[in-house]
Swiss-Prot record:
Pfam families in the record: Ribosomal_S5, Ribosomal_S5_C
SUPFAM superfamilies, per database record: dsRNA-binding domain-like (SSF54768), Ribosomal protein S5 domain 2-like (SSF54211)
Domain of life: Archaea
Xref: HAMAP family: Ribosomal_uS5_A (MF_01307_A)
Described function: With S4 and S12 plays an important role in translational accuracy.
Name of the coding gene: rps5
Free-text comment on this protein's domains from its UniProt entry: The N-terminal domain interacts with the head of the 30S subunit; the C-terminal domain interacts with the body and contacts protein S4. The interaction surface between S4 and S5 is involved in control of translational fidelity.
Protein name (Swiss-Prot/TrEMBL): Small ribosomal subunit protein uS5
Length: 218
């Protein structure tokens, strides 16, 4: 099976297409075997049964149109007994723009390897997002925004997502916009606290807020 996936790479938020060959994939987990054998046919079944995704190929099969965006690449230094070692750190977000999103971080000595690791982690971190029309100024009942006010936090960064009426758009910073767009959110107001210049914490705060829409008990 060959799956085409849109991948965003340098410059940030630009797009290219890669071809993923899944015919050579040998599942290592029971869930992976169930997916490859066709016993599980949708990503919804995985979360409905509280399964844990441990292989990114599961996501590649069940969400073949998954889009990916490179949010940031930094050169970081790590002190070892042999001296300082340089590595690249990449932050990647993935989503199908229809209710699923994930964020991951990867480190490696080469940029491409760091991006690949971050993409793999983002797929493993994929979560469903509950969408709706939660603004009292809008009554369209379409899943264009968040259904209620929800918050997310990572490090010093905290973000609040506020339902907005249709047509408002994404009132947020570039990093937040990318994650929200991949999740399928089209209209939302945001409030932030902390150092939003830290891309990883900012992206993870948005991710955690979106994750909370699904796990929040109404």
């Amino acid at each position: 099976m060959r799956v085409k996936a849109k991948i965003f790479i340098r410059p940030l938020f630009a797009t290219y297409v890669s071809v993923i060959d899944l015919s050579l994939w040998e599942p290592r987990t029971e869930l992976g075997r169930m997916v490859k054998e066709g016993k599980i046919r949708t990503i919804d079944e995985i979360f409905a049964n509280n399964y844990i995704i441990k292989e990114p190929e599961i996501v590649d099969i069940l969400l073949p149109g998954l889009k990916q965006e490179l949010l940031n690449v930094n050169l970081v230094q790590r002190q070892t007994h042999a001296g300082e070692r340089n590595q690249f750190q990449a932050v990647v977000a993935v989503g199908n723009e229809d209710g699923y999103v994930g964020v991951g971080i990867g480190k490696a000595r080469q940029v491409r390897q760091a991006i690949e690791k971050a993409t793999r982690e983002a797929k493993l971190n994929l979560v469903p997002v509950r969408r709706g029309c939660g603004s009292w100024k809008c009554s369209c009942d379409e899943p264009h925004s968040v259904p209620f006010v929800v918050r997310g936090k990572s490090g010093s960064v905290e973000i609040t997502l506020i339902p907005a009426p249709k047509g408002v758009g994404l009132v947020a910073g570039d990093v937040a916009k990318a994650v929200l767009r991949l999740a399928g959110i089209k209209d939302v107001w945001t409030k932030t606290r902390g150092d939003t210049r830290t891309t990883l914490n900012f992206a993870m705060a948005v991710y955690n807020a979106l994750r909370n829409t699904y796990y929040f008990k109404i």
